[in-house]
A protein has these predicted regions:
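Anion-binding alpha/beta catalytic cores of soluble intermediary-metabolism enzymes, centered on
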Residues: 1-192, 196-202, 206-207
């Protein structure tokens, strides 16, 4: 089921072009895009909708609605972004985070990003996701802070501070997603050998 919020005339015009029957959908007419976004997020806030889905609205205004103090979806925690990809040639879904919201996440924010991602993975059928904190190299280099963070995240997971997943980093992209590359590099001692579910990017530019 879906509730469509926006310019009803345009919604019906688009649906007609797609030969889509709207008889089973509720339509809330609101021609103003920003107001439509606020009304849509309020539906989720009030429990009338399970999910707030972005339409043709600027990401800036979309996020403003999500973070609205009166009707938004604030929980008090860190807001992060997860992309879910189905890629030909890869036998599983890939979860990429955070490639939209967090610019230069701190170690503490990376912990929260991972914790935010786990329920998304669970909802998609991945019970214990393998999380690869990405870096340019697979070894810790003090001159490359992202590798230090990756190693610390791995340790924190091993110590039970990040439950519900397996974290192994730092890892390069090829080691994270390509079993042949992992085999070629002799990564037989790694928890992740080309079979990562989650790619944790060090910053928004890498993502």
């Amino acid at each position: 089921d879906a509730i469509l919020v926006g310019d009803e005339a345009k919604i019906r015009e688009i649906a007609a072009g797609l030969n889509m029957d709207l008889s089973d959908y509720e339509i809330i007419n609101e021609p103003d895009m920003i107001e439509a976004s606020l009304k849509a997020v309020k539906l989720a806030h009030d429990g009338r909708a399970d999910m707030y889905m972005k339409g043709l609205i600027d990401s800036k205004n979309f996020l403003k609605s999500v973070l609205n103090k009166e009707v938004g979806l604030r929980t008090g925690g860190t807001l992060s972004h997860v992309c879910v990809f189905e890629i030909p040639g890869i036998d599983r879904l890939l979860f990429l985070t955070d490639v939209a919201f967090m610019t230069y996440p701190t170690l503490e924010e990376k912990v929260q990003i991972i914790k935010n991602t786990i329920p998304v993975c669970n909802a998609c059928g991945v019970a214990e996701p393998k999380v690869a904190p990405l870096a340019a190299v697979e070894v810790v280099n003090p001159k490359m802070p992202v590798t230090v963070d990756a190693a610390e995240l791995t340790k924190m997971c091993e110590e039970g501070q990040i439950p519900g997943c397996i974290v192994d980093g730092p890892l390069s992209l090829d080691l994270a997603i390509d079993p042949e590359a992992a085999k070629h590099k002799g990564a037989t001692d790694r928890k992740i050998q080309g079979d990562a579910d989650v790619l944790l990017f060090p910053d928004i530019h890498a993502g």
